[in-house]
Amino acid sequence: MKQLEKLIIEAKILTEPEAEVERVMQVCNACRYCEGFCAVFPAMTQRLEFGKADINYLANLCHNCGACLHACQYAPPHEFAINVPKAMAEVRLETYQHYAQPAAFGALYRQAGVTVTLALVFSLILFLLLAMGLKGSLLHPPLAGDFYQIFPHNLLAWMFGSVFMLAIGLLMAGVIRFWREISPVGPRPAEIAEASHNALTLKYLDGGHGKGCNEADDAFTLMRRRFHHFTFYGFMLCFAATVVATGYHYFAGWEAPYPFFSVPVMLGTLGGIGLIVGPAGLLWLNLKRSSLHGDARQKPMDRGFILLLLLTSLTGIGLLAGRDTSWMGILLAIHLGVVMALFLTIPYGKFAHGFYRCASLLKWAIEKRRGKQAGVAGD
């Protein structure tokens, strides 16, 4: 009787998307045909019931690869209408919104397209006006690529450093809350290593058989995994370029501009190329993906994030090409505006998915090694 009462109480507190994931997982747990596709299904088999914490954990463990959708005998148009990618995607959006900091800003996830647009317009206007205010004009004689003659170094360091740290801090505050609810135990070094390997290699975008995901149909492709790698490692190379340039400036006394074949410029150039190839490929795949695959309402968030990354790299490469011309001020203001828009939307856009997924991968590494000892905080 107590067990029945517990199930009734949990059913009342589940949202509609969470209740759908619970229904889908109950069917999948009875079938288990997809058990070898990814981490979601082995994690599912360790449960007979699916509470709120379990559902949010499994939803963020899902990589939206689509293999289970095309393999499922109960997928639409079957009357069971089992669509794991769609159900999981809808819960992921609720996860981001629920754990957003401050809480009121969680609503921005549901208007992600508008959020990205407003952030971009605001940032572009801000830096164009700053450039005009500091130099009196957007056009100027060539400055030999010296950005700091347009915007002082300390101003840029303060603006971008504070916004980036605040954005990451707000995002991490939500991820920590999420972690505490899905995992009552902390990780061990071996579990951290396994989760890191799975995240960095995107292991679960291989479809479980190494041939890749499904996109427009039931054909397998590794393109999504590869474009994700171009995007992630391109971003990390750009970040490394910033770190090296910061070290040059503060510790070695070497001030920008740096030659083309210097370490910061080469890292930034290679990263920029990765951030063109990767996002362009992901956008192409997003446009051709099956309508049954994922949550169509989230396409503005997905595409807005991809376009911001693409604009960041394109404007950065354009700035490098035009840094010795009288157009450098305009190019610099546009590039900085795009980067600022990206930073502003970090805690309220698609950027968050990587953090929540890594937390879920870590939970799975713990669970796989320790079984029921890993538990769920809500149990």
From Swiss-Prot:
Amino-acid positions noted as binding [4Fe-4S] cluster 2 in the UniProt annotation, renumbered to this chain: 38, 62, 65, 68
GO MF annotations for this entry?
4 iron, 4 sulfur cluster binding; metal ion binding
Keyword terms of this UniProt record: 4Fe-4S, Citrate utilization, Iron, Iron-sulfur, Metal-binding, Plasmid, Transposable element
Cross-referenced InterPro entries: Citrate_utilization_prot_B (IPR012830), NarG-like_sf (IPR036197)
Binding residue positions for [4Fe-4S] cluster 1: 28, 31, 34, 72
One GO term under biological process is: citrate metabolic process
What is the protein named?
A: Citrate utilization protein B
